Design a protein with these regions (language model features):
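Ligand-binding clefts/hinges and TM-proximal coupling segments of bilobed small-molecule sensing domains
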Residues: 68, 144-160, 191-194, 225-249
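Periplasmic-binding protein-like
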Residues: 35-37, 112-117, 185-228, 244-249
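Bacterial N-terminal signal peptides
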Residues: 5-17
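Pocket-lining segment of extracytoplasmic ligand-binding domains
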Residues: 117-190, 195, 199-200, 216
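Acidic, polar ligand-binding/catalytic clefts
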Residues: 59, 63, 68-129, 193-203
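Extended ligand-binding regions for polar small-molecule ligands
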Residues: 52-65, 123-132, 136-141, 205-247
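Short helix-initiation/N-cap motifs at beta->coil->alpha
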Residues: 38, 55, 70-81, 138, ...
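Short glycine-rich His-centered loop
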Residues: 27-53
Length: 249
């Protein structure tokens, strides 16, 4: 993650012949899960079409692999159970490799670097008495807060994170850095004059990867090779520029 990327948030709290051509007729469709209402990573546009950074990276990977992919949007907390049960092939979401997740699913190579941010009123610190922290249910941030014994306010989707702070139900929010981009688009949230700081915890920063069904280990090599190709041929950078105001790889 570049310094320019961090500064942005703290201030505003295929080559020819590769991956082109017809899809392979002998390959069944892959079921890909994305997170519902998690802009700018995955969301529905004005026509109801699923899009976003993670969604379009997944589509590019499918194209490189020459397979047909079917996308389903689910809540963050549903990703791990569905993947571990083999009910989907790929989770196209920025998942940090926590011990619990590694015991249940496989991971592709990283597609971006992630850090977490603590957003709260000045003087409000993690673990402070009386502070309730907004998190997304099923996220690494929720698991961390519960481990610390913090009172948390869990919401179903990233797009709902602003509401607990605006209403006063929560006094802080712990979020992935990229999620903070969308929070800052909410006028009522901006008017709270909250302070954004990088949250220093090894469990909440590092490489973010797609999840892979434990029943489809052969996909790991294919996905990783496709990811390398879209980074080399410029597709990755074009998607990055379309959805994010800074480089994440």
């Amino acid at each position: 993650m570049s310094r320019a990327a961090l500064a942005f948030l703290l201030c505003c709290v295929l080559p020819a012949g590769t991956g082109s051509g017809a899809l392979a007729a002998d390959k069944p469709s892959l079921r890909i899960l994305v997170v519902e209402n998690a802009p700018p990573m995955s969301f529905r546009d004005e026509t109801g079409h699923l899009t976003g950074f993670s969604v379009e990276i997944a589509r590019a990977i499918c194209s490189e692999m020459r397979v047909s992919c079917v996308f389903d949007a689910v809540k963050q907390g549903e990703l791990l159970p569905l993947m571990s049960q083999g009910k989907a092939d790929i989770a196209a979401a920025g998942l940090l490799e926590t011990p619990e997740r590694r015991s249940r699913i496989l991971f592709a190579g990283p597609y971006y670097r992630s850090i977490s941010l603590w957003v709260a009123r000045a003087g409000v610190s993690p673990g402070q008495a009386g502070v309730r922290v907004a998190v997304v249910g099923g996220s690494a941030q929720e698991a961390y807060g519960q481990k610390q014994g913090w009172p948390t306010v869990a919401v179903a989707t990233h797009g709902e994170l602003a509401a607990p702070l605006i209403s006063g139900e929560a006094q802080a929010v712990l979020v992935p850095m990229i999620t903070a981009i969308n929070l800052q688009k909410n006028r009522a949230f901006r008017q709270l004059d909250l302070v954004t700081t990088v949250f220093q915890a090894p469990e909440l920063s590092g490489d973010a990867s797609f999840g892979i069904s434990p029943y489809r280990p052969e996909l790991q090599k294919e996905i990783n090779a496709a990811l390398v190709r879209i980074k080399r041929n410029g597709t990755y950078d074009r998607i990055n520029s379309r959805f994010l105001p800074f480089r994440v790889s």
